[in-house]
């Protein structure tokens, strides 16, 4: 049955390891499945859609791994990915969405103190990488609209974390500042189950 969607997916490495996908009701002007750097394009982590009004980048940011073994790689990734997104934003307003694998502030993680600089996703290196997006003109639109709201988008499957709501907010919409006035609403839909992540949404008006 046709649902009138245009789809594109990207997965290069082992099945189940990484990958991104976008479904759209409108055919994009352009689809690109990499950032143009071999060292970062081996895991299918970025998908770019160019639309009439904005660019859309779907991302699955690398996890720094157990014992932070990939933290150096993650630091390099953050720099190169920001450069990529900044160049897109210079051409057209840009939305970046997906799993950023970082809890940006204490409000974004249920257990900040025991995880800080010990767990992947909550090191100062990763926090600084996210800060750089903000200092370069991108807005964490959920936190912009909900400065004090505690809501998470990911829970570890272990320790019944979902049932106890011991979670992390690591899934984001980062938008060019020029899109701020187009935002109607954004939400974290933690009422939905079926994954260790829950959906997030962004409503725009043009």
Indicate where each model-derived feature is located.
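Single conserved hydrophobic/aromatic residue that forms the stacking wall/gate
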Residues: 1-7, 12
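Conserved beta strand-loop-helix elements of the APE1-like EEP
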Residues: 16-31, 149, 160-181
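Surface-exposed cleft-lining segments at the edges of enzyme active sites
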Residues: 36-37, 62-78, 114-118
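Active-site beta-strand termini and strand-to-loop segments that position acidic
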Residues: 25, 49-52, 176-177, 202-206
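Surface polyanion/phosphate-binding segment centered on an Asp-His-Pro turn
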Residues: 187-206
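Beta-strand-turn-beta hairpins that frame and shape the catalytic cleft
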Residues: 44-60
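Metal-dependent phosphoesterases centered on the DNase I-like endonuclease/exonuclease/phosphatase
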Residues: 77-166, 170
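Short acidic (Asp/Glu) patches
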Residues: 8-9, 31-47, 73-82
